[in-house]
């Protein structure tokens, strides 16, 4: 079991008790069936302690690397949301402007009209746009399609071939298509690739060296990393580390480490990336998200708010992509925690009782985040 400083000097670490508590919870997650757990807690001064337990490679039995790189799935959405909010600050984008203003003629279909969907509704998942990920690619055997390159425009066409889920603004429904469209908005406004905008506006600004948006066709994880695993059609955990994450694109393609995710989320709220009014805008007016994200959750503009067991609200996001799950948030006192596991809860769940078993497995990850932020 490795325990040490993540992304900082050995002496730079939150309280020993906090790190030990995170370590024991991480060990509990391995016992629950996750191949490996990589976690980091970062205090409000930016000092981190890391944990790495389990097996980073099931074939060799090798230990997972401390603060290794993992696919961060939907945490990508918060990076995209920050870029959009920066563009709002710069007067290049209007939150309550219709997406039609920026992507004329693109967003249309059955019950779908880009002139009636605002940028804010896309950020908040209240647009009513149909979902693309329920038909591509992981609805069948992911191992058959994991190396397929599907251009983002094709993913959008898949979504727009379906009817709208609801009238814009009428409901909330977590939908990856919203962030596909926001990625296209960023590219249209900047005339540059969305990954490059994230790199220039966020990654370089914060000095992150293990956080990146994969280049087209990039299937491997560049830096030191644990292997990610998924359940094969034969019911075995198989290595799925190498895959083309393009189908996640601006909704879920990025790679980072636990400590760098903590740094990013702290920077979202401490003024390094956004003005206070932008930060308030992202949190205020957050809508009830308990139908999908569980009791006590709300969704702002690219942010998930969660009621803590000790009172107050944590803000972060979290991400799911084949092989990796990350749960992360920043607490009211500025402490940040990320817990990354190297298989989805559904992959280690009881397959005969899949839904409730996967929910129970994932709840343990969320509980580890809550306990750390509550200094338990």
Where does each model-flagged region fall?
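Outer-envelope exported proteins of Gram-negative bacteria
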Residues: 40-42, 98, 199
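Short active-site loop at a secondary-structure junction
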Residues: 33-35, 60-122, 166-175, 249, ...
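Catalytic loop of the DD-peptidase/beta-lactamase superfamily, centered on the K-T-G motif
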Residues: 11-51, 242-376
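Short, surface-exposed loop or secondary-structure junction motifs
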Residues: 111-314, 318
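Secretory targeting and sorting signals
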Residues: 1-13
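Hydrophobic (often cysteine-bearing) scaffold residues that line and stabilize catalytic clefts
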Residues: 18, 22, 72, 76, ...
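Solvent-exposed serine/threonine-rich low-complexity stretches and specific carbohydrate-binding patches
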Residues: 54-56
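Residue-level preference for non-acidic, small/hydrophobic
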Residues: 26, 45, 77-80, 84, ...
């Amino acid at each position: 079991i490795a325990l040490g400083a993540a992304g900082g000097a050995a002496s730079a670490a939150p309280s020993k008790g906090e790190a030990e508590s995170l370590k024991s919870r991480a060990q509990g997650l391995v016992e629950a069936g996750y191949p490996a757990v990589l976690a980091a807690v970062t205090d409000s001064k930016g000092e981190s302690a890391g944990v790495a337990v389990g097996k980073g490679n099931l074939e060799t039995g090798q230990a997972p690397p401390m603060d290794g790189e993992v696919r961060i799935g939907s945490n990508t959405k918060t990076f995209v949301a920050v870029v959009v909010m920066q563009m709002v600050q710069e007067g290049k984008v209007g939150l309550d402007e219709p997406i039609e203003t920026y992507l004329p003629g693109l967003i249309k279909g059955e019950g779908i009209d880009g002139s009636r969907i605002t940028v804010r509704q896309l950020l908040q998942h209240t647009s009513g746009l149909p979902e693309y990920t329920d038909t591509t690619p992981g609805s069948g055997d992911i191992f058959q399609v994991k190396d397929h390159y599907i251009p983002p425009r094709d993913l959008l066409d898949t979504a727009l071939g379906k009817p709208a889920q609801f009238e814009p603004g009428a409901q909330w429904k977590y939908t990856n298509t919203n962030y596909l469209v926001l990625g296209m908005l960023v590219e249209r406004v900047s005339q540059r690739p969305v990954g490059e905008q994230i790199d220039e506006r966020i990654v370089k600004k914060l000095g992150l060296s293990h956080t990146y948006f994969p280049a087209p066709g990039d299937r491997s994880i560049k830096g030191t990393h644990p292997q990610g695993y998924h359940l094969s059609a034969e019911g075995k955990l198989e290595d799925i580390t190498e895959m083309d994450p393009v189908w996640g694109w601006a909704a879920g393609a990025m790679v980072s480490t636990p400590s760098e995710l903590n740094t990013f989320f702290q920077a979202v709220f401490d003024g390094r990336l956004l003005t206070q009014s932008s930060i308030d805008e992202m949190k205020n007016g957050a809508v009830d998200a308990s139908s999908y994200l569980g009791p006590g959750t709300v969704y702002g503009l690219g942010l998930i708010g969660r009621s803590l067991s000790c009172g107050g609200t944590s803000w972060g996001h979290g991400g799911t992509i084949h092989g990796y799950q990350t749960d992360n948030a920043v607490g009211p006192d500025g402490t940040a925690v990320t817990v990354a596991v190297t298989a989805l809860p559904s992959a280690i769940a009881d397959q005969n009782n899949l839904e409730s078993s996967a929910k129970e497995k994932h709840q343990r990850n969320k509980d580890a985040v809550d306990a750390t932020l509550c200094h338990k």
